[in-house]
Amino acid sequence: MKLAVDTHTHTYASGHAYSTLIENARAAKQNGLTLFCTTDHAESMPGAPHYWFFSNQRILPRFLEGVGVIRGVEANILNTQGEIDLHPSVDHNLDWVIGSFHEPVFHPADKAAHTQALIETIKGGRVDALGHLGNPHFDFDFEQVIACAKAHNVAIEINNSTLKGHSRVGSIDRCYEIARVAKSLDAYITTGSDAHFCLDIGGLSLASQLIDEVGINPQRVITHTARQFLDFLELRGRQPIEEFAGLL
């Protein structure tokens, strides 16, 4: 499946990534993306940027190198109450919020705790997608969580970096099963490279392969076209982004 949007990318501001936003935009252009989301880690991750970094994203231009820039964050799920490490005052300056588990922030517990945390995060209404869910350290009830995500219009991320097999080892089979459950429940799917270096921006071939093999309806893959992604943001209650009105 052709994918026009990469919804999970990092700059060197994350503390363990190595490229600038301009470098990422150039790579996005070279790789044929229409839009990309810049989603540095929120402040609870070691080395992550300060609150102001996210609050000030309103100054970012809507296009860099001819590619649309979606202002975002990868927030950390903090606890079983579904709290995330992003002050609510930042929300109106961002277009896209991923909620993810990371071991340095949320210590792996048990399946019930992870399931509760994900469900409460969804119900909290502040995240647009759940990131890299395949991690076996954070097992959860696939059916319960994805059904809740479907009910609240929260997308399930297929993470290309995970599918390489080098990070979150043991995730690949789980990613395929998560995708199959998402297909059966007609949930929304998003795709992210999780790039920590510019040459990986738009690298979504393994995510695309998974989508094709599982047979997910392109209409449920919000990154299939820029318009599908922008329509999803509006479905989530975001205001239309005027500069992107002409994107297809």
From Swiss-Prot:
GO biological process terms held by the UniProt record: bacterial-type flagellum-dependent swarming motility
Key words of the record: Hydrolase, Metal-binding, Zinc
Its EC number(s): 3.1.3.-
Binding-site positions, Zn(2+) 2: H16, H41, H196
Note accompanying the cofactor annotation: Binds 3 Zn(2+) ions per subunit.
Disulfide bonds: none
Annotated residues for binding of Zn(2+) 3: E74, H102, H132
InterPro entries in UniProt: Phosphatase_YcdX_put, PHP_dom, PHP_phosphatase, Pol/His_phosphatase_N, Pol/histidinol_Pase-like
A cellular component annotation (GO) from this entry: cytosol
Cofactor(s) of this protein: Zn(2+)
Any GO molecular function: phosphoric ester hydrolase activity
Chain positions recorded as Zn(2+) 1 binding sites: H8, H10, E74, D194
HAMAP family: YcdX_phosphat
Family: Belongs to the PHP family.
NCBIfam families given in the database record: PRK09248.1 (NF006702)
Protein name: Probable phosphatase VC_A0894
Upper taxonomic lineage: Bacteria, Pseudomonadati, Pseudomonadota, Gammaproteobacteria, Vibrionales
